[in-house]
Amino acid sequence: EIHFLDPRPMANGKLLVRAQPFEAPDLGSQLLEVDTDNYVELAQPTLPNRGVLAGPAQVPATINDVRTVEGPSPGGRYNSAFPLQDGTGRILLTRSQCRLLEQGAAGTAQIVPCSPERLAAGATATAAPLYGVWIYDPAQKTQLPVSTPVEGTVYSDVVAMQPRALPPVLLDRIAGVDYDADLEAEG
């Protein structure tokens, strides 16, 4: 069971969401872009787009192989994301890279990065997540650290404060349609 959390509008008109199971491994999720303007369901476009679009309505927001099930996630996991409204499409996010526990020569576990070789060899004991602040550039397909993670510290929320126009207010009801307009006039 997947939940879509923290929806945020993106400059491209889509919604950025965190897809996360109810019990998320390592507090992590996958980032998705959801096309709410053209779809009503994953593979069901709106009526004007019927026969034109086939889906899916949601696609990964990054190029990383992120998995939301127990065990290693080769592309790491995300804990929060905030699209920058600066015309670049970049996303400020918190991310933990994939880390494994490997038994050292002295029998002690050491933290090592995920690699295709380690994953193919069955190294599935994951290390505790290490969330830092990153910036993702979809045009360049790059992720760069903004704040280097520190063992024992979790960066869990990011926001970008910048001036922008207020979004439109969608009222629950419309006077004269959903209720008597005279009642609204009376206050």
What residue ranges belong to the model's regions?
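Short loop/turn segments that connect beta-strands within beta-propeller blades
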Residues: D35-Y39, D137-K141
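Structural motif
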Residues: A24-D35, L100-S115, A120-A121, A128-W134
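Structural signature of eukaryotic scaffold interfaces centered on beta-propeller domains
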Residues: I2-K14, E70-T88, D157-E184
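Beta-strand C-termini and the immediately following turn/loop, strongest in propeller blades
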Residues: V17-E23, F82-Q85, L93-C98, G122-A125, ...
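Surface-exposed loop and turn segments in beta-propeller and other repeat-based domains
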Residues: E1, D37-S73, V150-R164
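Beta-propeller domains
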Residues: E1-D37
